[in-house]
Amino acid sequence: MKAVIIGAGEVGYHIAKALSPKNDVVIIDKDEEAAKRADELDVLVIEGNGANAEILSRVLQNADLLVAVTGVDEVNIVACMTAKLIMKNKNGWKDTKTIARVSNPDYIDSPVTSRAQVGVDLMICPELALASEVADILSSPSAIDAEMFAEGKVRMTEFAISPESKLVGKHMQDLKLADCCIVSAVFREDQIIIPHGDDLIKANDHMVVVGKPESMEDLESVFGSKVSHRTRILLIGCGIVGMYLAKLIDKEENADLRIIEHSKSRCIEVAEILENALVLNGDGTDVSLLREENIEDMDVVVAVTDSDEKNLLCSLLAKQLGAKKVIARADRSDYLPLFEMVGIDMAVSPREATVNEVLKLTMGRGIQTLTTIEGERAEIIEYTASEKSRIVGKPLNKVKFPKGALINMVVRGKETIIPRGDFIVNEGDRVVIFSMASAASEVEKYFK
């Protein structure tokens, strides 16, 4: 496959990094430093304006995908429109799929949408996708990550095991999980473990659990402490991410939301839109304000300002003052491990949402949903099995599935099944798989 990426910032760089090992990748950026960094990858780098028709004409022939992910919405949209016009006027050229990263809510009102009428096959808003991800996590206060698959029939939730947890020292088989619910993987420092019943649970393990949403309702009592009151949430920053997240939380009956926003005019605007939230004009680093709002009683503090450094400081203060759980936005990929190293419960990145959507388009026809976890070290992938899929029609114990991958769930009609060795996958089944990043390309071969 040939992919053209416009923009070599955080998002563009990581898309190129993910695609370059097995694809022809061209990356365009007018910033000299960004282009120089991209040149470290096995890609063709062009220094210039990615919306320029002359440059696009040179690289679009035989391209399967064009991804415009600069920091300017209009440049991304114009690049996609220009690409479509060029292809329309070139006889015999394939119709390249176009993707644009867009942040302005005037252009987009959902995380992913199509604007084919203006030449954009897929429009992705990383900020809205991030807000949706955080809202899913907030539905389970003890979780550090969450995702839905198979149109809501399967849920993935990731939990961190604290040193004080009653689970430390127990065997996997001692976990009292509901039916149709399994531990898919354990992340332990640099290790990724597909667990067995006699494996011990250790402090600071990150455990990925997959199951029916209704079967996972009691996981709070297994992995954390079940909250008996309305979930108390403090949101710091109400920009694009914060506003969209606040709207999602505001609809929940079981949530008590407070917002700290430094801009007075923005506070007035937010207060007029939200029905149930308390909006405070102030600074998330103001210790007196945090104490006045009884931050030690907060179940979750979410810092989503536009500054990574401010989010880090707000999060550290919240932790120090007794907040039970802290989630922070980190746009820079090199900051993600730093946030968790200093004790922040979870660092979330708008970049990952865009990378996930692009990878889903490039990895094969059968993919329905794909999400990366633990800093792109592993993936949860949902495939739809076709008549030609190698996995169809034989017992799973006869299928030599790649090492480092595990079939977690199969959705067949209204049924959600944990497959055993004698289970046979049928055409049309939706198969949810945990895979280490190194095994993902091998997994794909079973569904072609």
From Swiss-Prot:
The keyword Repeat applies. NAD(+) 2 binds at residues 232-262. Keywords: Ion transport, NAD, Potassium, Potassium transport, Repeat, Transport. GO terms for molecular function: potassium ion transmembrane transporter activity. NAD(+) 1 binds at residues 7-11, 29, 70-71, 101. Residues 1-124, 230-348 form the RCK N-terminal domain. GO terms for cellular component: plasma membrane. It holds the Pfam family TrkA_C. Residues 144-225, 368-448 form the RCK C-terminal domain. Part of a potassium transport system. The RCK N-terminal domain binds NAD and possibly other effectors. This is expected to cause a conformation change that regulates potassium transport. This is Trk system potassium uptake protein TrkA homolog 1. It comes from Methanosarcina mazei (strain ATCC BAA-159 / DSM 3647 / Goe1 / Go1 / JCM 11833 / OCM 88).
